[in-house]
Each structure stands twice: as structure tokens, then as C-alpha cells.
Amino acid sequence: MLLKNAVQLICYPDRIGNNLKDLYTVVDTHLSEAIGGLHILPFFPSNADGGFSPLTHKEVDPKVGTWDDIEAFTAKYDLCVDLTVNHISDESPEFTDFIANGFDSEYADLFVHVDKFGEISPDDMAKIHIRKEKEPFREVTLSDGTKTRVWCTFTEQQIDLNYESDLAYQLMESYIGFLTSKGVNLLRLDAFGYTTKRIGTSCFLVEPEVYQILDWVNQVALKHGAECLPEVHDHTSYQYAISRRNMHPYGFALPPLLLYSLLDANSTYLKNWLRMCPRNMVTVLDTHDGICIPDVEGVLPDEKIKVLIDNIDARSADPIMRRSAANIHSVGAIYQLTCTFYDALMQNDDAYIAARAIQFFTPGIPQVYYVGLLAGCNDHELMEQSGELRDINRHYYTLEEVEQDIQKPVVQRLLSLMKFRSNYPAFDGHFELNYSNNSSVAMAWRHGDYYCHLFVDLNFKTVKVTYTDVETGETRHLEC
């Protein structure tokens, strides 16, 4: 494994302070012993979706910093960066060249031209997995007045790439080579499941094409000294498929599983999952997205999922729903719950520390989202200003707020756990799920003479961590 076996921080380039320099100051001052890496969300020039509509992956948005700022991180920490494999901005040089030169553009085949599919029947439209309140197509007018349609899964500004063309692979390889030259060693493959377009299917995670694309990206990344973290929210079986392909899967089932376990004081389903979950995961409790429900389907019974949703609903903004391209106004089951993880646990410090302790003892590399690091609460004001439901969990912290919140008792307890997880050698060894009753969890790690054990009582939300001091041979207790 190329990555340090340590906690990583997930953060925006401009929401802990104003820019990358501010972020580095906070990390170096408060977190240097607590983390081994960072996932810095998109810092590229972008015109939509909070950075996820990049004009290029070869520039840093000057509003947040320079490549020197990025390389300051990579000199000391692992760095995960988003590679938006599905789309690029409509303001990118490639798409603006297509608008100017039409189908004579050297980049014309880089995009998915909807009209090549002919008329799409209502039945086929109904199958397409969509992410907005309209069909995933956009009509554009070329400079000569010709109108044509291109595929755009997300916002109108995010134009999907055509993986039936060599141009898409050439673009991705150039991005991967450039990012790794700056020290990036983990590529988060954003929205990769939407790269497959085959009418008559969901156009989402279509096999075998999706794995052919993934395997190619992973091969190129490994050649350049980086690993891959494909991002997909769907049935947990996809995470196993990713793991088998020598890539890191997300442990996206863990957040809803832990919420259910702590709110209902029932560890049965959590322990069932821990017995079989991939061992090379990246685990999260919170991210810049909401708490996704599809990831836990098949792990939690449907009636337990309903109990969880009903419990959290009062502390969440409106949920994000699943939609059909045939009828954009019809909604299916809940896709994401929108609230901070701390609020989901009713701002209960002990429950929150219990959740983090279980995350840190779960196999894989743990990531902590910046709002979660500071035990942040729902930012209703930002959400109402932007109209984006997920902004409830995307607070802009001033440096003064960080200095204040980092001293909160719950945050100091979390930092103690993070330092232990990032530095105690037992986590380089073997995972053990020990026997416990259905209202508790017992987990351990062993590596040579190093041994650590976690016991969590889900009723009382108490956490007990013990570990071996190899210098004295004594068993010690971690204050958390």
C-alpha cells in the first residue's frame, strides 16, 4: 500500500480559513500528529457544483492558492484529489473549441452526442439514472447556428465525457500524469458510475464497460505512483467489486449502520457487516455529500432503514430523492439525508465519540470531514442562502471559529482518538471482531507485541480503549 495507515482529513480549499495557506496553518498547528493525509476537495478553476465542474485539472484556482501550496501538503502528507472522470466544464478549452468549430473541432468526439442514439423511447428514458429535475441532456447552439444535444448528468455546466472515444482516455491520462507529478498519491474517481452510456440500460454502472474504464484508470494511476478511490453510492456489492480490482472502496455503509446502531442500541447488523466488509476500505462518517441510504440497502433490513430515516428526519433538511428521467417530477426512495453527523446523533458528545472510535477500529483508512472534526452543527443559514440542501453540512469556518471550536471538549476527545489511530502500530496488523452482546461492540487490532482493544456500550454510549505499552508490557487506558 502506498498510503500511510493513518487518519485523513477531508476539507475544502477555502472553508477552513480563506485559502490553502490558511488550511495548511491549521493542519500544521493542530493536526500534524493526528493525521497522515488529506483529501482536499476540488481546488481547480470551476464554474459550478462547488468545484466539481473543473475547467482543467492542471491549474489551481488563484482565489485559493498555487501549486506551491499543494506541494507544501504533499511534502509532508498523503494527498487525495478528485479526478472528475465523468465530465468537464462547459467553459473548458475543449468544450469551447467544440462550440466554436462544431463537429470539425478536434474535441468533438470527446463529448456524448445524444442525437447519435436516435429517438429514445419513454421506456428507455425511464431506465436512465438521473441526478437532477430534468432529463440528462442539454441543447447547445454551435457558432454556425446549428443546434445539437450533449449529455450532462449533473448541472448544465458539467458536460459528460465520451469513453467510446480515445480522446477521453488521453485527457484522463494527461490529468493523472500531471497531478501525480505534484505529489498526489490517491485519486478519488468522482461519479465514475455515470461514465457508461448505453440506451436501454440505467446508463449507470453498466457492465462490463464500467469496469473496463475503472481498470484502465487504475492501471494508469499505478504506473504514476498513485492509488484509486472510486466513488459510488449504490448497493454495497459494488464496493466488493472495487476491492477485488486492487482499488480502495468506500465504506459508505458504515455511516447509516453506525447511526442505526447508536440510536437503537443494537449492534447486530453492524457486526454482520464488520465480519465481511472489505479490508482495504476508506471509511467515512461524513463527507461533503449527504448520508446516503442506497449504500446500506441489503445490509440493514428495509424496516430498520425506515426507523433510521424517521429518527433523523426531524434533525435533517429535506432529503434528496431518487428520480426517473421519464417523469422528472416523480420521486422514488430517499437517496441522501442532509445533516451533520453530530446533529444526526442529537449533538450527544458520548455517542459521537463512540461512533468515531468504532470507525477508527474498523478496517481501512479512516477519513474525518472538516465539519465532523469540529463537531459542527447544521448550517441552516448557508443552506437557505444557496438553495443547496447539502450546504447544511458545508460551513465556512473562519480561523477564529476554528481556534474556538478546536478547544471544545468533544473535539479534544476526538483528536486524542485520531492521534492514537494514526500512530499506534497495532493498526498495521490483524483485525479482530470480538464477542459482545447485541447492545455492544468489541474490536481489536494485533501486530506483534502491539495490541489494542475497543469496547463500546451502545446503551450508555461509553467507550473503553486499552492498549499494550510495549516498553513496559503494561496495559494502558486511552482517555477518550
UniProtKB/Swiss-Prot annotation:
Gene3D superfamilies, per the entry: Glycosidases, Oligo-1,6-glucosidase, Domain 2
Gene Ontology MF terms in the entry: 1,4-alpha-oligoglucan phosphorylase activity; glycosyltransferase activity
pH dependence of activity: Optimum pH is 6.5.
UniProt KW keywords: Carbohydrate metabolism, Glycosyltransferase, Transferase
Lineage: superkingdom: Bacteria
Binding annotation for substrate: Y194, Q336
Keyword Glycosyltransferase: yes
Positions annotated as active site in the UniProt record: D190, E231
Main EC class the enzyme belongs to: transferase
GO biological process terms held by the UniProt record: glucosylglycerol metabolic process
Reactions listed under catalytic activity: 2-O-(alpha-D-glucopyranosyl)glycerol + phosphate = alpha-D-glucose 1-phosphate + glycerol
Temperature-activity note from the record: Optimum temperature is 37 degrees Celsius. Full activity is retained after incubating at up to 45 degrees Celsius for 10 minutes, while only 46% is left after incubating at 50 degrees Celsius. The protein is completely denatured after incubating at higher temperatures.
Practical applications: Might be an attractive biocatalyst for the production of the osmolyte glucosylglycerol, which is currently produced on industrial scale by exploiting a side activity of the closely related sucrose phosphorylase. GGoP from M.adhaerens may offer far higher productivities due to its high specific activity in the synthesis direction. Glucosylglycerol is commercially distributed as a moisturising agent in cosmetics and can also serve as a stabilizing agent in protein formulations, or even as a functional food.
EC number: 2.4.1.359
Consequence of changing Q336A: 2.6% of wild-type catalytic activity
Result of altering Y194A: 2.7% of wild-type catalytic activity
Alphabetical list of InterPro entries matching this protein: Glyco_hydro_13_cat_dom (IPR006047), Glycoside_hydrolase_SF (IPR017853), O16G_dom_2 (IPR045857), Sucrose_GGa_phosphorylase-rel (IPR016377), Sucrose_phospho (IPR022527)
Signal peptide (from-to): none
Job description of the protein: Catalyzes the reversible phosphorolysis of 2-O-alpha-D-glucosylglycerol with retention of the anomeric configuration, forming alpha-D-glucose 1-phosphate and glycerol. Has most likely a catabolic role, either regulating the intracellular levels of glucosylglycerol, which acts as a compatible solute, or degrading it when the environmental conditions change. Cannot catalyze the phosphorolysis of sucrose or glucosylglycerate.
Family: Belongs to the glycosyl hydrolase 13 family. Sucrose phosphorylase subfamily.
Protein name: Glucosylglycerol phosphorylase
Taxonomy of the source species: Bacteria, Pseudomonadati, Pseudomonadota, Gammaproteobacteria, Pseudomonadales
